Every structure is written in structure tokens, then in C-alpha cells.
């Protein structure tokens, strides 16, 4: 029997990229999933009886509570929360950053995951079990990978991850983070390249080029690689891994 058989997961950002890869892999291993995304759910997921979906904006005040209540109504419990949804920021430096970009990045990349954790923790405490996995980035541990808003949002999420891990470690609840390298998903394509801070990008180009070289040599990180790590962290095989920040980037994080 699969280690994920019948476990119940909430997966945000499940309509594309890493979220889609994770939901697809989890379903193939017998998990029950509530997917959440601002976009429509792919037919490849909705055809599964064990997949339920909410199309919602995670920054709306009522959404986190709605997500958790729906999961309990559909499946009766919550074994794992995977906070995968996120946006980029145009690589804006602090002196080119707009208020709108700062607020959107923080709202989606930091505030929404924290509010979802706030909603699931009481249920996990009652169950005396649960695993939360937050998705970071190279920018979660470095200042030379993205713009100031994205970098701040991912650093903040790593701090929240560690705090939650420590606070609830005696209650059977774990909280970890996975930091992907440059995975080819729609997150970059969703932004307008004409608005990017090209001067800021130029200062990071040697870092980005080092990672791009891996892809050219067939060593690039794929969404499925991230999914494998995420699902390991919600499985019983990782029961003593708690508060970890795990890069999945073929050593990009050592730069």
C-alpha cells in the first residue's frame, strides 16, 4: 500500500506548475485532495473521484476558512497542507518597487499561507497529527535571486515555517519548506517582461546563468522533482523531519 493511500491533502496552486505535478502524483498514490487555484482545474484532475476543487483567490479574507471548511466537509480530516501558490515580482529593486507589487507579493506569497496555516492548525491539534509544507525559492535564502518583494515574502515564509515547526512539535504537527531551483512553470511567463527591472536583473545574471547551464546540460530541476520532495514530507517516512528548509535545485543553493 502507498504511504499516501487515503491521506487528505490541501494543495494550493494545483491548476498548474508544481501544484499540478504534486496533485497528479498524489492522486496516483491514493491521496484525497482538495485543490485550490484562482484558475480552472484541469480535467486531468477533476476526472478523479478523490479530487475536489475550489476556484478562489487566496487573498480574499474569507477564502482560507472556506478552504478548510470545505476539506472537512468533503473528507472529514486534514492530514497535510501544501502551500504552493505564488507569484513573482518583476525583479523590482527597492527603489523601483510599486506599492501594488509589494502588497500583491506579500499577500499571495506570505499572508495567504500563514492564514491557511492558522485555519488548519486547530484541526491538526485536535487530530494530534498533520504535516504542513511551504514552498520557498532560491530567493528564500538569498538576496541575489529575485526582486525585493518576492525575496522578502519568501524569507518571511521560511521564518513562519520554523516558528510553526517549533511551536507545535510536541503535538504531532510538522512544518517544513521546500525551496525549488529554476523550475520551468508559468510563474515567470505570467509576468510582463516589459515591466521587469532590467538593471536589477543584470546584477543577478551570473547567478541565473549558472543555474540555466544545468538545464542546457540536461540537469535541470523539473516540477515532478519538487512534487516528489513535497509528498515525501507529508508522508510518514519523514516523521522526524520538522522545521527543515530543503533546497531542490541541483546545488544552486550553495552559491
Curated annotation (Swiss-Prot):
GO terms for biological process: terpenoid biosynthetic process. Pathway: Secondary metabolite biosynthesis; terpenoid biosynthesis. The keyword Transcription does not apply. Pfam families: adh_short. NADP(+) binds at residues 11, 118, 150, 154, 183. This is Short chain dehydrogenase adrF. Belongs to the short-chain dehydrogenases/reductases (SDR) family. It comes from Penicillium rubens (strain ATCC 28089 / DSM 1075 / NRRL 1951 / Wisconsin 54-1255).
Amino acid at each position: 500500500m502507498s504511504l499516501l493511500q487515503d491521506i487528505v491533502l490541501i494543495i494550493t496552486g494545483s491548476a498548474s506548475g508544481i501544484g499540478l505535478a504534486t496533485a497528479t502524483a498524489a492522486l496516483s498514490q491514493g491521496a484525497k485532495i482538495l485543490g485550490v487555484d484562482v484558475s480552472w482545474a484541469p480535467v486531468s484532475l477533476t476526472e478523479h473521484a478523490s479530487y475536489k476543487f475550489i476556484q478562489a483567490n487566496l487573498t480574499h479574507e474569507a477564502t482560507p476558512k472556506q478552504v478548510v471548511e470545505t476539506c472537512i466537509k468533503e473528507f472529514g480530516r486534514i492530514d497535510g497542507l501544501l502551500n504552493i501558490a505564488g507569484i513573482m515580482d518583476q525583479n523590482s529593486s527597492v527603489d523601483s518597487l510599486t506599492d501594488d507589487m509589494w502588497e500583491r507579493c506579500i499577500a499571495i506569497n506570505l499572508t495567504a499561507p500563514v492564514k491557511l496555516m492558522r485555519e488548519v492548525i486547530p484541526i491538526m491539534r485536535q487530530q494530534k497529527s498533520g504535516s504542513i509544507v511551504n514552498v520557498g525559492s532560491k530567493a528564500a535564502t538569498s538576496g541575489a535571486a529575485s526582486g525585493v518583494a518576492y525575496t522578502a515574502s519568501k524569507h518571511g515564509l521560511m521564518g513562519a515555517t520554523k516558528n510553526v515547526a517549533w511551536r507545535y512539535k510536541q503535538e504531532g504537527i510538522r512544518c517544513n519548506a521546500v525551496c525549488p531551483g529554476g523550475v520551468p512553470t508559468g510563474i515567470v511567463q505570467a509576468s510582463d517582461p516589459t515591466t521587469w527591472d532590467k538593471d536589477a536583473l543584470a546584477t543577478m545574471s551570473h547567478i541565473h546563468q549558472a543555474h540555466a547551464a544545468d538545464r542546457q546540460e540536461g540537469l535541470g530541476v523539473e516540477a515532478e522533482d519538487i512534487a516528489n520532495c513535497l509528498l515525501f514530507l507529508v508522508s510518514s517516512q519523514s516523521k522526524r523531519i520538522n522545521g527543515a528548509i530543503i533546497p531542490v535545485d541541483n546545488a544552486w543553493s550553495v552559491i
